Amino acid sequence: MKIFQPKIISSLKGYNGHKLLSDVIAGVIVAIIALPLSIALAIASGAEPAQGLFTAAVAGLVIAALGGSRVNISGPTAAFATIVAGVIASSGMNGLVIATLMAGVILIILGLCRAGSLIRFMPHTITVGFTSGIAVTILIGQIKDFLGLDFHGATPVEAGEKLIEIVKNFATLQWKALVIGLIGLAILIAWTILASKIKGKASMLFKMVPGSIIAVIVGILVVQFTPLKCATIGSLYPTLTGGFPKFSLPEFKLDTVIAVIPDAFAIAILAAIESLLSCVVSDKMIDDKHNSNTELIALGAGNICSGLFGGIPATGAIARTAANVKNGGRTPIAGILHAIIILLFLVVMMPVAKLIPMPIIAAILFLVAYNMSEWKSFLGICKTRKVGDIIVLVTTFLLTIILNLVVAIIAGIVITLIFFLIHKIKEKKAAKN
């Protein structure tokens, strides 16, 4: 198999009007799903809302056009939230851009070295551990906006410090913000339940319109036309404007480059794992086989472009990819169209985005955290696996919350190797006896 072989080339053979219509429908629906998520995930990452949309548009387009999967949809994901927030806090936005560019280069090198098949061998206990840890971190990070709390200063980055601030400032709770947040959460939960139970023609509404869009619309209407008022994206980001993403080179300082090297590797590894996992899932849905090395190269190019055009790290998004397939997307054209639609939203609809209430964003992220938590897998490992696997799982989980993702992954790999060596030593001793 060739190292670089974009799927768009083979996908366009025999392309016709029927396939185009299916891709257009899927592209529009996925864009509708991605819009509120991209804004929410950027905020959760400590970036500006528009940066999430820049990422979905720029990286989403590049990766779809060059990628090794027919249907993978890329953009900002919850997995990056904690690491991106940490880089911004320690090295600023300039440091994040450098880390994103470096991660892009690392991903391209991994693809050229045919490392695509190797990355999928990351132990399941480690991926479940850090994914669950990220989910808890995201949940903790959104309590402030959900309750309308005032921290009287900069919001801390570490989850433990955030919990302390939440307790200290709980008296500043705004009941109006809480009510709006609960309305949003109720809509999201009800929409999810109804989407799984309603059949027939009525089910098309729930498939085509995500609950997050309904929650956003209701939230805006409540804040604009009732006495219930709370912080909005516009009130927290008054300088937020629309328009096309602008090209900008970061300021390369040696100390900053050195400081973000571990973060760049973490971003690259995480992007590779999540994107290739998304490819594997989508392969089963459409009975196809992706080119993992091509996907890594495209992922690298997409992250480089995202960094240069004001975005944050991007990777394949499993939920958006599944929505693409379920709504008829079968070629990279759907992913490209989804990116173009988001780009158009950036140009003409940003004033509407500024009206979105922050408790609604928090509610959306609560559901994102729940969906990515893998709590069933977590409990399953604790019930059925050996003690060594449980230690790796819990250690990775706790270190992701307490310290950061880089430390968690390294610790998980080291502990896994130690238990593997102990197992091999015991096997040799048993063989001698």
Map each language-model feature to its residues.
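Transmembrane helical cores of multi-pass ion-transport proteins
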Residues: 1-433
